């Protein structure tokens, strides 16, 4: 490490200050020490690159994370420090300054500073004689960045620079503060080095603002400084410091590395801790769930146990009841038999017959008597009824008479009221006449007063109008005054001659409340200039005029004010007059009243002059008074008559009341008698009916009871059966619970074992780390000791502090580790305790809930039992009967009481009424007579009443009987309803219990089914994983082999191209390659083609170089080249060498080749180097992926073993349980059969005990039977479920097959139409040209196509017929093609696979070809560059591409991209795409251009840019295989599908069948001749012919467009494009495909998504996202007819790849 103090000179110090002798001596000693040092050491120090670096300051490094790569880069770059802001010293600088400067400098600083401009290590120091003066304060440098976790090493010294506050070091980093403990302070005196610098004249001259920029100047200055001041004390000091710094540097670096390592380890441990915590959380969750399940199970157990106990008690009770009932039934049977015998005996006896006859005769006599009595009673009743009617008639007559009397009285009252009303009216009239007479006397005076009033009112109106006018004038005047005041403010006032007017004006202002204004003193505030602003005289005139007008206005104003004051005075006068008139009016009214009174009292009045009128009035008044007196007398008489009438009326009313009361009393007595008789009869009938009803009821009760008992017994038997079922279910549930518990235990054990192993591993790791740290620390301590001893020998100071500090460091590190471990343990403990507490609390709560539930259930059960047992108890029945009797007795007593109470009340009423009657008897004789007559009638009626009452009683009895019967019926119905309700409730309860039991059973069933399904699923998943792992391994191996083979081939070819190749060496190379290549796909043809391609690439670079060197020559030859190209375009079918690069003539190449050989070689080296680098990278990636895959495989295998073991255990346990249950069931069945044989013939004389003993084992046997049935049912369900799963899978497979077939048929129809149209178009085009051969070929193909397309799914027999039906022309075609395969090796494998193989081969070939594409990429780039140069000259319009079937000539397609050579036209193979070699050259520029260019928008944008690098993207065709030939042959790209091993194919087919991936072909084909004319998806073909043509005879002109659109991405510079650009390009290509893909063959429609989606073996990882997006876009743009099938089959690999879990086999394949 070097000291870097910047580039600013030291501050000049004062020379006047004193110099100390001691300092001088110390300085001399240091100089001697430094001179003694060897020169070699100095040279080494200076020459070492480390010294020329400066550390970055704290400010620079803090908060910047730096990588070690950046550090290394910055250390290797030798740059100058930049002068930056002075913020204090850097970390390391300050450290070494603090270590080496010592405290002597601190003590003697004040002395030395005064005399010498010395270099203080705190302020600055030169760097090993570098020749530039460092700054006084530290400057930041951006040379290099230390890592974030870099910590400087300070030996624990405190640095206190008292004189310079800016030089105090403050370590801001918190991590560094850990290392500075309190022990550091005591180590100050260990390392104090005194240094006395020597004064040099050269240093004083250093300018403070000097800055050096450049490494050359830096070195020059260094050399100068060394040469000038070799012997100076300063130089020696700096060298010494540098030596020490180097040592410290190394120590620091070691420590930093250790720190970094420790931090990494800590991070790793933290990461592990987090993982462990997550695992712990997961386990706690699972524990909780399992506990919950366990508790639920326990609760269920408890509930079921309670139910079992309840049912057992019920069973026992029922057994007891059964025994009792059997005893009772026996006794009843005996009694019945005895009664029957008695009845028979009685029937035979004669005495009984006699008794019966006697009884019958007695009954007849009684009935006759009863009938006679009834008849007599009816007669009496009729007589009483007639008497009553007569009395009612009399009463009605009396009522009518009373009503007439009331009417008469009302008429009299009305007459009286009319008379009174007439009298009142006459009185009022007379009073009015008197008033009129009084008023007529003062009429004249009133008239006069009214006249005066009218005048006064008029005057008032006039004055009001005047007031209004005055007020309006006032408002106007006020406005004018405001105007005048404003004028006065402007300085306008009247002249002195009119002073009087002014005085008046001011007074009037004061009156109106306007303030006085001093007109003379007021200043003019505004000057108006309107007329002529230039003339001064006009202003004065204007002012004078204004003043005159104002004076006139003021005068008029004063006049108006005078008028206003006058009018106000007039108004006041008017008001006074009005008030006077009002007073006069009041006086007159009072006088009138007085006169009226005087006239009434006095005969004459002085006021009124006419006396005759007053006399007349008086006479009238007297007459009226007399009339009033007469009327009053009449009124009194009428009142007296009214009083009399009222009295008579009251008497009549009283009499009537008495009559009514008497009648009511008599009526009541008769009713009472009737009631008594009725009651007696009612009671007698009641007793009779009650007895009969009770007898009936008892019979019905017995019948019902028997029926209920039967139903009860049936229900009990059903309940028993159900209970048995429940018990069986419970036992099964218990077994399941036990299995679950066992599983949980095993899981826990495994988890505990894993935890233990993890803990052990952790402990081992920690121990290892501690040992490593300890060893490293020991080594560092030893090294540091040695270094410090060396340093001490130079400076005579033993720096023991270094060692101490290292020990401290080690201690600190250990302490940190301990603290971290303790913290971790504490956190773990806390977490565990918290979890335990939570669990305990939850368990307690659940336990409490369980207990409460159990208690509630027990209480409910007990209550139900008690309720059930109550009605069966004999005591309960006896109590019920006793209570019934009591109730009946109480009811009878209460009824009797009520009757007696009613009778007594009636008697009392009657007595009271009698007394009232006696009191109110009138003395009238008439009334007495009437009463007597009535009494007589009553007596007569009383005699008749009993007969009537009897008849009524009979009616009442019949009615009462009916009512009672109805009541009885109602009661019976109610009883029946209650019983039905009880039965319904009972049934509902039973149904509920049954439903609950069924639900439990179904739940358990579903749980079991779910468990089995999960187990099956896990097994399936495991098998899938195994298969995927194996596939991945196989694919990886194949990829690796292909990569190695391609690398070897390329290496050999590239090494060969640099030398001049000889024919002999070619054969050797071929042999070497064939021997080295492990894979069988290598062939002579492939090797030749590769070689040809490389040669062509190197040849094509020459014209590029020529063009760059000589542009003028290029311009001259442009015309010639275009002519040549045109001439070549006209000649069809010419297979000359111009096809290689038609833009350059061969002669020119020959001349230029020698000159440009060197350039070519350089380009070769560059290209090859790039290729090799890429291949190496790919290899490394492959190896990494392999390692990861192996790890994943191991992990998977381990998991599989575990799972298998667990599943096997579970299966074994289940089987054991089932077998045990079956054995038990068989045993129980045997026992049951034995018992049944015993119980088949039970004797009649068996006792109750024997029956009981027989019943118990029967119930047990039934239970066991139920249990066996349940186990069988469970087994059956399992089998059914497995069968159902298999059937559903088969159904799904069939559905898939059916859909595939349907879709294929649809696509076949569409393809057929499309091909027919295309062929018709080709025929038409060929007709224009007039080529008869082509027409014949096309016609023959049309016929074959039509035949084949009519039968898309044909059997082998059909294919044979089609084969025979092929026309001669197609056979001729094949023969021609075969004849052209001269030089090609026929041993290339052509894989004709089975149906199931078709999908698998596609995916595999895709994976296999990925490295091939990468290897061939750079060659293709060179080809593109060369072709780009040749295409430049051709216009945008290019001719339509056509394929000639016979001779293979074709035209260029307009939709080709510009940077692709016209020689490589993409054609469609059977399984992928290849590039077709064009035979023809370009035709005229003016030839018609097709509108296909719109289909390639992104290719058009690329233009003339040659692609610098072409890396195959994920959407490129996966089955490309590029082959090259010699330069003589036509260059073409062929498509191969070579699978070397048929065994692997078979294996793959098996696997594909296992995965249900089936793709039946449209047409079966075994032979090439069979497959002609139809696109076969089952057979994949390899092109062997040199001619690039379609083996299947498709019209190529139309099919090239989609193939081009898919393939064109190979020619785009995808390596340098961003993701967004690529996605845009893909979108555009997909737009093109939308219109063209439906017409592609079936093979291509299935392949294109495959090319995009299946990319397992591709090593580049950054392409995965692009792959997904491309696939989505492709699937969205393709039409439904094409997309449906591939999407179904090819989305599966994508989803599997996306799985990034630890267990997944596709961990990092992307």
Swiss-Prot record:
Q: Name one GO biological process term.
A: cell projection organization
One molecular function GO term is: protein kinase binding
Q: Does the keyword Protein biosynthesis apply?
A: no
Q: What does this protein do?
A: Necessary for centrosome duplication; the function also seems to involve CEP63, CDK5RAP2 and WDR62 through a stepwise assembled complex at the centrosome that recruits CDK2 required for centriole duplication. Acts as a molecular scaffold facilitating the interaction of PLK4 and CPAP, 2 molecules involved in centriole formation. Proposed to snatch PLK4 away from PLK4:CEP92 complexes in early G1 daughter centriole and to reposition PLK4 at the outer boundary of a newly forming CEP152 ring structure.
What protein family is recorded? Belongs to the CEP152 family.
What's the subunit arrangement here? Interacts (via N-terminus) with PLK4; the interaction is mutally exclusive with a PLK4:CEP192 interaction. Interacts (via C-terminus) with CPAP (via-N-terminus). Interacts with CINP. Interacts with CDK5RAP2, WDR62, CEP63 and CEP131. CEP63, CDK5RAP2, CEP152, WDR62 are proposed to form a stepwise assembled complex at the centrosome forming a ring near parental centrioles. Interacts with DEUP1; this interaction recruits CEP152 to the deuterosome. The interactions with CEP63 and DEUP1 are mutually exclusive. Interacts with CCDC66.
Q: Which disease is it linked to?
A: Microcephaly 9, primary, autosomal recessive: A disease defined as a head circumference more than 3 standard deviations below the age-related mean. Brain weight is markedly reduced and the cerebral cortex is disproportionately small. Despite this marked reduction in size, the gyral pattern is relatively well preserved, with no major abnormality in cortical architecture. Affected individuals have intellectual disability. Primary microcephaly is further defined by the absence of other syndromic features or significant neurological deficits due to degenerative brain disorder. Seckel syndrome 5: A rare autosomal recessive disorder characterized by proportionate dwarfism of prenatal onset associated with low birth weight, growth retardation, severe microcephaly with a bird-headed like appearance, and intellectual disability.
Q: Tell me what this protein is called.
A: Centrosomal protein of 152 kDa
Which organism's genome codes for this protein? Homo sapiens
């Amino acid at each position: 490490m070097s000291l870097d103090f910047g580039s600013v000179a030291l501050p000049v110090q004062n020379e006047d200050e004193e110099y100390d002798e001691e300092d001088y001596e110390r300085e001399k000693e240091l100089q001697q020490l430094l001179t003694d040092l060897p020169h070699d050491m100095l040279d080494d120090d200076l020459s070492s690159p480390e010294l020329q670096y400066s550390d970055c300051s704290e400010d620079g490094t803090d908060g910047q994370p730096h990588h070690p790569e950046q550090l290394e880069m910055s250390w290797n770059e030798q740059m100058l420090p930049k002068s930056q802001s002075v913020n204090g010293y850097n970390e390391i600088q300050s450290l070494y300054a603090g270590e080496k400067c010592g405290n002597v400098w601190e003590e003697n600083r004040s002395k030395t500073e005064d005399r010498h401009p010395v270099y203080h290590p705190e302020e600055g120091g030169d760097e090993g004689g570098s020749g530039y003066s460092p700054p006084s304060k530290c400057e930041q440098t951006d040379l290099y960045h230390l890592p974030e976790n870099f910590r400087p090493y300070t030996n624990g010294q405190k640095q206190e620079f008292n004189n310079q506050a800016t030089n105090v070091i403050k370590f801001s980093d918190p991590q560094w503060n850990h290392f500075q403990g309190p022990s550091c302070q005591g180590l100050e005196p260990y390392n104090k080095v005194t240094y006395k610098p020597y004064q040099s004249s050269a240093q004083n001259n250093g300018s403070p603002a000097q800055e050096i920029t450049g490494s050359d100047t830096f070195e020059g200055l260094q050399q100068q400084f060394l040469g000038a001041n070799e012997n100076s004390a300063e130089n020696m000091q700096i060298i010494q410091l540098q030596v020490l710094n180097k040592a410290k540097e190394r120590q620091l670096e070691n420590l930093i590395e250790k720190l970094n390592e420790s931090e990494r380890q800590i991070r790793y441990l933290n990461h592990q801790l987090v993982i462990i915590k997550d695992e712990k959380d997961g386990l706690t969750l699972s524990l909780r769930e399992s506990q919950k399940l366990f508790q639920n199970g326990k609760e269920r157990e408890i509930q079921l146990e309670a139910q079992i106990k309840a049912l057992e008690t019920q069973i026992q009770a029922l057994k007891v009841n059964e025994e009792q009932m059997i005893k009772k039934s026996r006794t009843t049977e005996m009694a019945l038999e005895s009664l029957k015998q008695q009845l028979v005996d009685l029937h035979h006896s004669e005495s009984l017959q006699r008794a019966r006859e006697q009884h019958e005769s007695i009954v007849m006599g009684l009935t006759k008597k009863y009938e006679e009595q009834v008849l007599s009673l009816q007669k009496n009743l009729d007589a009483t009824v007639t008497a009553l009617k007569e009395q009612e008639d009399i009463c009605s007559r009396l009522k009518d008479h009373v009503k007439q009397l009331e009417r008469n009285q009302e008429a009299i009252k009305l007459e009286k009221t009319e008379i009174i009303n007439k009298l009142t009216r006459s009185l009022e009239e007379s009073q009015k006449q008197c008033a009129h007479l009084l008023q007529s006397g003062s009429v004249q005076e009133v008239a006069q007063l009214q006249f005066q009033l009218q005048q006064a009112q008029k005057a008032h109106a006039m004055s009001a109008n005047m007031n209004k006018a005055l007020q309006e004038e006032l408002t106007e005047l006020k406005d004018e005054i405001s105007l005048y005041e404003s004028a006065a403010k402007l300085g306008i006032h009247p002249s002195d001659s009119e002073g009087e007017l002014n005085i008046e004006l001011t007074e009037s202002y004061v009156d109106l409340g306007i303030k006085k204004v001093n007109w003379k003193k007021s200043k003019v505030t505004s000057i108006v200039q309107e007329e002529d602003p230039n003339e001064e005289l006009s202003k004065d005139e204007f002012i004078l005029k204004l003043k005159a007008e104002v004076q006139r206005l003021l005068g008029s104003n004063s006049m108006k004010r005078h008028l206003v004051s006058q009018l106000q005075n007039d108004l006041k006068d008017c008001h006074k007059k009005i008030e006077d008139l009002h007073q006069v009016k009041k006086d007159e009214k009072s006088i009138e009243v007085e006169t009226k009174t005087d006239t009434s009292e006095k005969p004459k009045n002085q006021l009124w002059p006419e006396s005759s009128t007053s006399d007349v009035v008086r006479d009238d008044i007297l007459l009226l008074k007399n009339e009033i007196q007469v009327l009053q007398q009449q009124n009194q008489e009428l009142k007296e008559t009214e009083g009399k009438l009222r009295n008579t009326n009251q008497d009549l009313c009283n009499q009537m009341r008495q009559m009514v009361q008497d009648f009511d009393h008599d009526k009541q007595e008769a009713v009472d008698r009737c009631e008594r008789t009725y009651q007696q009869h009612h009671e007698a009938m009641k007793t009779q009916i009650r007895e009969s009803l009770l007898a009936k009821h008892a019979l019905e009760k017995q019948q019902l009871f028997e029926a209920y008992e039967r139903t009860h017994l049936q229900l009990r038997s059903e309940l028993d059966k159900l209970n048995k079922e429940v018990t069986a279910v419970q036992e099964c549930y218990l077994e399941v619970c036990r299995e679950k518990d066992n599983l949980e235990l095993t899981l826990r054990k495994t988890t505990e074992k894993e935890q233990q192993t993890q803990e052990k591993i952790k402990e081992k790791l920690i121990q290892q780390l501690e040992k490593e740290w300890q060893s490293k620390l020991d080594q560092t301590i030893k090294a540091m000791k040695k270094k410090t001893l060396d340093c001490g020998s130079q400076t005579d100071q033993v720096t023991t502090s270094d060692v101490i500090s290292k020990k401290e460091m080690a201690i600190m590190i250990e302490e940190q580790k301990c603290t971290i471990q303790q913290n971790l343990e504490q956190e773990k403990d806390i977490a565990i305790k918290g979890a335990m507490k939570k669990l305990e609390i939850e368990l307690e709560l659940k336990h409490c809930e369980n207990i409460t539930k159990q208690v509630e259930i027990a209480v409910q059960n007990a209550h139900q039992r008690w309720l059930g047992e109550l009605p069966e108890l004999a005591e309960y029945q006896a109590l019920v009967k006793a209570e019934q009797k009591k109730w009946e007795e109480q009811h009878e007593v209460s009824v009797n009481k009520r009757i007696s109470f009613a009778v007594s009340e009636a008697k009392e009423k009657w007595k009271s009424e009698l007394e009232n009657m006696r009191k109110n008897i009138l003395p009238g004789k008439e009334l007495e007579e009437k009463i007597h007559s009535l009494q007589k009638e009553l007596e007569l009626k009383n005699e008749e009443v009993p007969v009537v009452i009897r008849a009524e009683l009979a009616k009442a009895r019949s009615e009462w009987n009916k009512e009672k019967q109805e009541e009885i019926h109602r009661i019976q119905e109610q009883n029946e309803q209650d019983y039905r309700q009880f039965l319904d409730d009972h049934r509902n309860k039973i149904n509920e219990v049954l439903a609950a039991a069924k639900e439990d059973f179904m739940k358990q069933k579903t749980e079991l089914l779910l468990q089995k399904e999960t187990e099956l699923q896990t097994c399936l998943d495991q098998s899938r994983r195994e298969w995927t792992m194996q596939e991945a391994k196989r694919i990886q191996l194949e990829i690796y082999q292909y990569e190695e083979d391609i690398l070897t081939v390329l290496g050999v070819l590239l090494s060969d191209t640099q030398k001049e190749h000889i024919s002999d060496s070619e054969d050797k190379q071929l042999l070497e390659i064939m021997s080295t290549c492990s894979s069988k796909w290598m062939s002579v043809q492939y090797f030749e083609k590769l070689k040809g391609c490389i040669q062509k690439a190197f040849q094509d670079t020459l014209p590029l170089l020529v063009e760059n060197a000589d542009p003028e020559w290029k311009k001259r030859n442009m015309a010639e080249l275009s002519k040549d190209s045109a001439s070549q375009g006209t000649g069809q079918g010419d297979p000359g060498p111009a096809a290689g690069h038609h833009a350059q003539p061969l002669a020119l190449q020959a001349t230029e080749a020698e000159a440009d050989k060197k350039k070519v070689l350089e380009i070769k080296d560059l290209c090859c180097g790039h290729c090799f680098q890429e291949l190496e990278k790919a290899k490394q990636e492959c190896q990494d992926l392999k390692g990861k895959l192996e790890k994943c495989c191991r992990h998977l295998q381990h998991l599989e073993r575990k799972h298998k073991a667990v599943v096997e255990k579970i299966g074994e346990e289940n089987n054991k349980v089932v077998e045990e249950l079956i054995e038990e069931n068989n045993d129980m069945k045997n026992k049951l059969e034995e018992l049944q044989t015993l119980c088949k013939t039970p004797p009649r004389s068996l006792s109750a005990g024997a029956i009981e003993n027989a019943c118990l084992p029967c119930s047990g046997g039934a239970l066991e039977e139920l249990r066996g049935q349940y186990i069988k049912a469970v087994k059956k369900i399992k089998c059914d479920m497995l069968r159902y799963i298999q059937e559903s899978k088969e159904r799904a497979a069939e559905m898939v097959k059916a859909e595939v077939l349907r879709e294929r048929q649809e696509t076949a129809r569409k393809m057929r139409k499309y091909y027919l149209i295309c062929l018709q178009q080709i025929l038409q085009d060929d007709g224009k040209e007039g080529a008869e051969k082509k027409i014949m070929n096309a016609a023959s193909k049309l016929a074959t196509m039509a035949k084949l397309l009519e039968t898309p799914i044909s059997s082998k027999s059909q294919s044979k017929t089609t084969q025979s039906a092929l026309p001669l022309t197609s056979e001729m075609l094949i023969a021609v093609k075969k004849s052209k395969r001269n030089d090609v090796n026929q041993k290339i494998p052509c894989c004709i696979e089975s149906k199931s193989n078709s999908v698998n081969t596609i995916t595999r070939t895709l994976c296999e070809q990925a490295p091939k594409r990468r290897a061939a990429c750079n060659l293709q780039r060179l080809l593109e560059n060369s072709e780009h140069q040749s295409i430049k000259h051709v216009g945008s319009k290019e001719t339509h591409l056509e394929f000639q079937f016979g001779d293979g000539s074709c035209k260029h397609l307009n939709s080709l991209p510009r940077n692709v050579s016209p020689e490589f036209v993409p054609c469609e193979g059977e399984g992928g795409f290849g590039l077709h070699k064009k035979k023809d050259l370009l035709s005229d520029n003016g030839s018609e251009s097709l509108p296909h260019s719109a289909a390639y928008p992104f290719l058009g944008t690329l233009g003339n840019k040659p692609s610098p690098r072409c890396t195959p993207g994920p959407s490129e065709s996966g089955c490309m295989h590029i082959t090259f030939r010699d330069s003589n042959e036509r260059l073409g790209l062929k498509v191969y599908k070579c699978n070397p091993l048929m065994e692997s194919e078979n294996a793959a087919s098996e696997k594909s069948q296992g995965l249900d991936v089936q793709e039946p072909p449209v047409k079966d084909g075994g032979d090439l001749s069979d497959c002609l004319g139809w696109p076969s998806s089952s057979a994949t073909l390899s092109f062997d012919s040199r001619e690039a043509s379609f083996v299947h005879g498709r019209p190529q002109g139309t099919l090239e467009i989609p193939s081009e659109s898919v393939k064109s991405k190979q020619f785009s510079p995808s390596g340098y494009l961003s993701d967004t650009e690529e996605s845009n390009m893909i979108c555009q290509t997909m737009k093109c495909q939308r219109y063209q893909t439906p017409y592609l063959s079936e093979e291509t429609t299935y392949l294109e998504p495959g090319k995009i989606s299946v990319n397992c073996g591709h090593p580049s990882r950054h392409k995965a996202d692009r792959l997904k997006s491309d696939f989505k876009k492709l699937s969205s743009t393709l039409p439904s007819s094409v997309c449906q099938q591939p999407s179904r089959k090819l989305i599966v690999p994508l989803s599997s790849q996306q799985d990034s879990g630890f267990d997944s086999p596709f961990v990092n394949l992307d």
